[in-house]
Every structure is written in C-alpha cells, then in structure tokens.
Curated annotation (Swiss-Prot):
This is Peroxisomal membrane protein PEX16. Belongs to the peroxin-16 family. It comes from the Eukaryota. GO terms for cellular component: peroxisomal membrane. Keywords: Membrane, Peroxisome. Its main location: membrane.
Amino acid sequence: MTDKLVKVMQKKKSAPQTWLDSYDKFLVRNAASIGSIESTLRTVSYVLPGRFNDVEIATETLYAVLNVLGLYHDTIIARAVAASPNAAAVYRPSPHNRYTDWFIKNRKGYKYASRAVTFVKFGELVAEMVAKKNGGEMARWKCIIGIEGIKAGLRIYMLGSTLYQPLCTTPYPDREVTGELLETICRDEGELDIEKGLMDPQWKMPRTGRTIPEIAPTNVEGYLLTKVLRSEDVDRPYNLLSRLDNWGVVAELLSILRPLIYACLLFRQHVNKTVPASTKSKFPFLNSPWAPWIIGLVIEALSRKMMGSWLLRQRQSGKTPTALDQMEVKGRTNLLGWWLFRGEFYQAYTRPLLYSIVARLEKIPGLGLFGALISDYLYLFDRYYFTASTL
C-alpha cells in the first residue's frame, strides 16, 4: 500500500531525514483526509465575517497560507504519483498539467517565475489590506501598482521562456489526483488486479468461452475513452499550446499589461480628486469616473478578440488548434464577467442590485445567513481592488 511508496520515495532522498520528510510521509499515508482538512480550513476562512477590521486581515492571511500549503501538497502528491509504477494504468494527466509540468521541470526560468507570480497572487489582497491600514489610500494604491507591475514583468518573462506560446491562466499543474485515487495508485499491482476483478464483473462468451468485462449501458462512452489515446496524450507536452504569430503576441501582451494599465488609471483618478481642476487632463473623457472601467474593458475585449482571430488564422492555414488552445481562449473569455464587479459599473449597478438582494434575504426566515455572507464579501468588493482581480 502507501508504505511501499513511502519506501520508494525515501530511497530517492540521500539526505538525512528532517521534519519536512516526516511531514511528507504523513501526507502520503493520509492522502485521503488531506483534501477534507484543507476544505474545512478554507470554509472557516470563508465563513469568518469580513466586516470587522480585526478579522479581515487574519482571515485573508489564513486563506493565503492555505493556498501556499495546498501548492506544497500538490508537489508531494505529484512526486508520489511519479514514483508509483501503477500511475500510468490508473491516472491520465490533463493537457494543462502535462504542459505546465514539462515547463516547470525543463525551464528553470519558467519554474521560478511561475512560482513567484503564484505566491504574489496568493498574498496580494493581504498586502493591499496591510498597506491601507498602515499608510492610507496613497500607500494602498502604490502597493497595488507595484504588485501589478511585478506580475506583469514575471508574465512577460514567462511568455519569452515558452517561446511565445499563450500563458496558461494557472501557470502550475492543478491537483487532479484525489486522496482516494492516490491510494489506488500506491497499491501493489496484485491488489489492483484483485480489486479490478471485483469491481468489473466478467461476461463469458457462450461459443468461444472468452471473458470480457461488462459495461454499464450509460457508461459506454466513458469506458471507451479510457481505452483509447487522444492526440493530446501522445503529443509532446510543449506542443500542447500552439506558437503565437505576431498579432497573437500583441494580444498576449495586451492581456498581460491590462491589469497594470487599469490600476494606473484608477490611481490617476484617485489623485485627481485631490488636485485643482486646472491640472487635470485636457481630454474630458479621461477625467470621467467611467474612463478606467471603459478603457480596461476595451483592452481586455480587444485582446480576447485578437486571440480568437489567431485561432481562426490557424484553422485557415491548415493547423488544427489544440484542445488546450481552445480551452485557454474560452476560459479567458469567461473572465470578462468579472468586469461586472469592477470600477464604476460595480458602484452604479452591481452593488445596489446585490445589496437589494441581501435586504430581501434578511427578511426571509432561514436565508438571513446567506444574506450576511454575501454582505461580508460585498464589504471586500467595496474596499479592495484585488478582490475582483483575475490575473
């Protein structure tokens, strides 16, 4: 069982055991319960109210630490899967995981940049809260622009390290191996065969006497998919995302720089509130409170449109876009919905609508708790920029 896998992992480590090694062994032996423990702790950070000043920083710090811990758990689980001889028969990684895992293992620059941008993403809201509490609004906006500048620089470096392939929204492998699946992967081959025989009843053919596994009528398609290889399964990992052309690179740069441009426009708007009217921009539109929201949305929509045109040019040239290409473009398009929770649109339309829903929920017995939970998150959307950040 898992003890055998722990021994295999120990053989690969020549250094003396440390408390971290002991924790790794504990994690592998209790993989089934790790996910539930993480979920419970995250639920605590969700439920704790955000409207109390003494709690918001603590809860967001807890949430950030849990994300970092979860990322470390993913690394240990991936190492355990790689050390198991049964992994190939039970687990098939997704194209996203194959792609990101290859770059992390083969490109040190991508590895460190992806980790850095991930850690910055985990802690950005906490940093904004601390900056606002200690230095006021001006310090908060300087912190926001600094963080967005760091993330943009890291993503541009990652774009170059992939030789100008689209960046994955999540630059590291997702956790696809659950605790139960890890226990299955870690079992001996004999145990796996016995369990498979118990779970898959055999049907004996009357004429030849051969036996074949019975398949549930509703699961025929899923059964066949487990027996065949897709093109994504045999293609080289670094080819799972296509190379961008010149206009595709421009679209990717717009997507990377959009958060920084939007934050700078919001900062300029904040500064304009405290300066004389004579020093403001000569262009009336830039002085409008809607200017940052409109410009940011136009930049992001233009980037998505250009990425869609890149996929179309691939098809017209005879190249079939990969499944990961299409999934990434579709996922970015779905992120446009977050503009409902940003800037002047949120203040003018989304916020009043949500507060009216909260007021109605509080009048319905049994639903007041949900209204209070929504109100707690609206507190964060009202006061902090990174609450609605997606990159």
